[in-house]
Amino acid sequence: MNKESPNIRIIDIAEMAGVSVGTVDRVIHNRGRVSEENEKKVRAILEKANYQPNLMARSLASKKQYHFLATNPSFKPGEYWEAISEGIDKAASETELYNVNVTKLFFDQYDNHTFDAIVRTLFDEEDIDGVLIATLFTDSVVRLSRELDARDIPYVYVDSNIVGEHQLAYFGTESYDAGFIAAKLLMSQLGSHSDILISRIVHSGKNDSNQGKNRKEGFCQYLTEQGFEGNIHEVELRIDDTDYNFARLDEIFRANPRIEGAVIFNSTCYILGNYLKERGLENVKLVGYDLIGKNTQL
């Protein structure tokens, strides 16, 4: 029946069970008194029909306004966070008719202080029904999560997960596993004595990206398990500063000619990729993340 009647109504269930509509309503919502016999009949039909309450219709009828907040890193066209922002916009558009309003709060993904600043204004909003949190900065996100817990406001995480908090859901990949697989992929192309370059984008404040930290942990764990005997070199690069980046990378590669592999744990793989291409370092294998335009064009 569940395939034939996906939109079964309460009145249909009442007719099949031989009870009143009010009895079905009380069983579905666990309210009021219902005889054991009638409850069994109704629940049997609910299970057989795979009945799910029509939450959208209920929302339309209730007149209640729902207000959700979404913390969203600022981005340039084609960057990783653009797709997530567009997804939020799409969800907001599709649920607007059901009394749902979504407000986006933007911050600099390379500066945890800007995230803390929007958090300070977040609770100026009235009647918050839920928050979507971009989990770039672990310490800041944990503080926000615990404040939301104290206020009994539900929240979900996007991008990377943080274990031990009370998020309703997490949307993203397993960061640690992604780093582990990246190392496995890179080492399949290198010898155990090859040197590896790990690049990171400089962040303002004291926090690196939670996603990047987890990926790096998984990456290094694989190397340890495989008995990696080469050296790991690390370099800090700047977003949108090609001259600085090329100068730093020139220094690294001149001083460490045995570097044969490189990895960056966020969506800015194109920075290293463009350098390697420009310098003709075709022997260096590069691993990165996220199918944004600048990366796929390499």
Language-model-derived ranges and their functions:
Residues 130, 152-156, 169, 195, ...:
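Proline-centered loop/turn at the N-terminus of a beta-strand
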Residues 130-149, 233-294:
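Hydrophobic alpha-helical
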Residues 1-62:
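N-terminal helix-turn-helix DNA-binding module of bacterial transcription factors
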Residues 94-98, 151, 223-230, 277-284:
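Short helix-capping segments at alpha-helix termini
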Residues 137-177, 292-297:
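Flexible loop/hinge segments that line or gate small-molecule binding clefts
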Residues 53-117:
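Amphipathic helical "hinge" segments at domain boundaries
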